Amino acid sequence: MNTALAQQIANEGGVEAWMIAQQHKSLLRFLTCGSVDDGKSTLIGRLLHDTRQIYEDQLSSLHNDSKRHGTQGEKLDLALLVDGLQAEREQGITIDVAYRYFSTEKRKFIIADTPGHEQYTRNMATGASTCELAILLIDARKGVLDQTRRHSFISTLLGIKHLVVAINKMDLVDYSEETFTRIRKDYLTFAEQLPGNLDIRFVPLSALEGDNVASQSESMPWYSGPTLLEVLETVEIQRVVDAQPMRFPVQYVNRPNLDFRGYAGTLASGRVEVGQRVKVLPSGVESNVARIVTFDGDHEEAFAGEAITLVLTDEIDISRGDLLLAADEALPAVQSASVDVVWMAEQPLSPGQSYDIKIAGKKTRARVDGIRYQVDINNLTQREVENLPLNGIGLVDLTFDEPLVLDRYQQNPVTGGLIFIDRLSNVTVGAGMVHEPVSQATAAPSEFSAFELELNALVRRHFSHWGARDLLGDK
């Protein structure tokens, strides 16, 4: 057993008491991102090593792997703790998103180590979608690069409000305060293009040597701020969904017998309590909450993030994908929306195409009306394009086959986040974040049906010699 873990269990008075203490610790999900070879995996390995989260057999295996695949000479190559795929180890890069768990006396952590290469943008977006904080690594020798800007943009696009700029490899610039100050100034200048409500912190460190990672560095007396671990342990995460109105997407209708009918799901935002008047959308039918059933019995109230089953006082028609909210809230269903899209397929996203989409348990079909622009994620400029390529990010106009109840993604990631599914292969080909739902009053009517637009796109793609015009060319 890990000696540090054994000591914690002994201090708590046994395994059961230790497990109870773990349940009451707060959990922080964060990701590491940066340019190639900035030391992301090494930093995670250092965090695991210095917080004594590595078992003896893992340490022994790490010694052997360092000799075979290591890049640090006689030293332990801590990056190998995270770079698990054979292809990653052979190339010395991170390809897939690697998740690791560790805990300290103050907090629990889930780390997502995301790829730095531009061709793996989709992997990074996947890792960032569940995180609350991003560690942006910058090589002290290179400063702020295009990939630093790209990762900052993707992180904020996916709703991350806390950025820790870790200026790594300070040992290779003689722990220069001037270098740290210059990079800090350069990043803050760039950050003026990002949303204004961000919490940005800077930590100079050396992941290889352990400076300012879990313990204060003696080599940088000019830095009096917290270590990286202290930042992670003390940062206050204010979840957006806690302050938002109630949203309960129905994932499953639970009917084990004739005497029970419940609606299971995870409360996406807000709170719900027994006796509360709720409304079902899109039908608009109202009822009262009779019971809130959980795995450990009935509760009087529930909060965002909790998996619950709601029992209503009335027998009404509710199915998977319906949304429950407070009865006094007016939330109109919309049939169009502008969506920030991260495209993940080899086949580009083009106007006129139709895809299945899934949002908060609801599955329907959407048509691409047009692409407003693609973002150059290296300098955040916008440019007009005919289609959105693999790993491209852009703002897209969608029309849905049926009215949907949507929130802006920055307000509610559950009811504002969607995925695109290819109708033939059933493969997820893209991720979308609702930028702005378009009400019926502002939506422009289309003179062409969904079938006509899809047929037009098919003809232009496969029979370009026919010279068919783009029916959406005027948009």
Curated annotation (Swiss-Prot):
Pathway participation: Sulfur metabolism; hydrogen sulfide biosynthesis; sulfite from sulfate: step 1/3
UniProt organism field: Escherichia coli (strain SE11)
Positions that bind GTP: 34-41, 113-117, 168-171
Any one GO biological process: sulfate assimilation
Pfam families xrefs: GTP-eEF1A_C (PF22594), GTP_EFTU (PF00009)
Stretch forming the signal peptide: none
Positions of region (G4): 168-171
Protein name as it appears in the record: Sulfate adenylyltransferase subunit 1
Gene that encodes the chain: cysN
This protein's UniProt keywords: ATP-binding, GTP-binding, Nucleotide-binding, Nucleotidyltransferase, Transferase
Subunit structure: Heterodimer composed of CysD, the smaller subunit, and CysN.
Domain tr-type G: 25-239
Function: With CysD forms the ATP sulfurylase (ATPS) that catalyzes the adenylation of sulfate producing adenosine 5'-phosphosulfate (APS) and diphosphate, the first enzymatic step in sulfur assimilation pathway. APS synthesis involves the formation of a high-energy phosphoric-sulfuric acid anhydride bond driven by GTP hydrolysis by CysN coupled to ATP hydrolysis by CysD.
EC number: 2.7.7.4
Region named G3: 113-116
PANTHER family cross-referenced by the UniProt entry: TRANSLATION FACTOR
Reaction(s) catalysed (UniProt annotation): sulfate + ATP + H(+) = adenosine 5'-phosphosulfate + diphosphate
Family named by the database record: Belongs to the TRAFAC class translation factor GTPase superfamily. Classic translation factor GTPase family. CysN/NodQ subfamily.
Region annotated G2, chain positions: 92-96
PROSITE patterns referenced in this protein's UniProt entry, alphabetically: G_TR_1 (PS00301), G_TR_2 (PS51722)
GO MF terms held by the record: ATP binding; GTP binding; GTPase activity; sulfate adenylyltransferase (ATP) activity
Region of interest (G1), ranges: 34-41
Record region (G5): 206-208
